Structures are given as C-alpha cells and as structure tokens.
C-alpha cells in the first residue's frame, strides 16, 4: 500500500509539473522602448522583448518562465502599456519582484505592476481593447525624430 501511495504522489507531481496544474497566474503590466528589439515575440537569432522578460523572470524565480503577451509589436515599435501573463508555482511578493525585475532588466523595459489573477485569465484572449497611436509631424523637428514619422507633404485627413 505504501508503494502505491508513493507512485500516486509521484504521478500527481509529474502531471502537475507538466500540465501547469497547481500553479498561480500573474499578469505583468510593462512598458518598453522597442528601438533595440525585433518586436515583442521571440524570434531565433534576434533580441525580443518577450525573450528578455522570460530570461529575467527565469533567473529571478529560479524556474523557466514563458510569458504570454496580450499582443505583438513589430520591430522598433514602443509600448506605453502592455500586458502579459505567466504561471508560477508559488505566491509572489509583487512589489519586491517588480523592484528586482526593474533592477535586472535593461533600461528600455520597465515593469509597472504584477497582479495575481485567476488561473483562467489570459492576457491575449481576455483583452477588451487595444489602442495604437501613430505619431507624425509635417516638418523636421530634432525633438520628434525618434518617436514619430516625418511626412512633409500636405496631409489628407479625409482620405
């Protein structure tokens, strides 16, 4: 009987570790300047925001972490507010982890908040809206050359 209990416990531990049971889900609110990244999503042989965040979380939490983003951005695109989620097998001190992540991450990525959510919550599928801002200017401006697009022809806003 003891042998069967040990086998049952080992099987339970194996299943829960492989299939994500017994984990807690957390949303991360972050912002980033995308100039140095190939975008949000992981790409082989390129530096992505997702990969950078995965590495930082995995090192600090001492477990491989894969974040799931609410959306994707392209190469060089910035995000003022982005959400992602990850699963972890223990309770997290959110304020402490935010502080550690911001000390560890490069200066162009900032974690604003970490929030415990229900296990069913999904950053991508539960997002209610997405807002995109496009910045253009119609004259050369040395202060706006990095975060906007220069368009020197007259704009046709009715088109």
Features from the language model and the residues they span:
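Compositionally biased, low-complexity intrinsically disordered regions
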Residues: 1-4, 10
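Intrinsic disorder
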Residues: 3, 14-17
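A general, composition-driven signal for non-globular sequence regions
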Residues: 12-15, 66
């Amino acid at each position: 009987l003891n042998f069967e209990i040990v086998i049952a416990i080992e099987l339970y531990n194996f299943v829960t570790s492989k299939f994500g049971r017994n984990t807690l889900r957390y949303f991360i609110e972050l912002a980033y300047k995308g100039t140095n990244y190939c975008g949000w999503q992981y790409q082989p042989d390129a530096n992505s925001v997702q990969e950078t965040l995965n590495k930082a979380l995995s090192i600090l939490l001492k477990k491989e972490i894969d974040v799931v983003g609410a959306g994707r951005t392209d190469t060089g695109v910035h995000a003022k507010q982005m959400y992602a989620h990850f699963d972890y097998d223990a309770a997290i001190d959110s304020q402490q982890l935010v502080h550690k992540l911001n000390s560890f991450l490069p200066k162009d990525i900032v974690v604003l908040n970490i929030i415990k959510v229900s296990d069913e919550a999904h950053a991508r599928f539960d997002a209610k809206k997405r807002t995109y801002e496009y910045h253009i200017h119609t004259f050369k401006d040395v202060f706006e050359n990095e975060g906007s697009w220069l368009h020197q022809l007259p704009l046709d806003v009715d088109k």
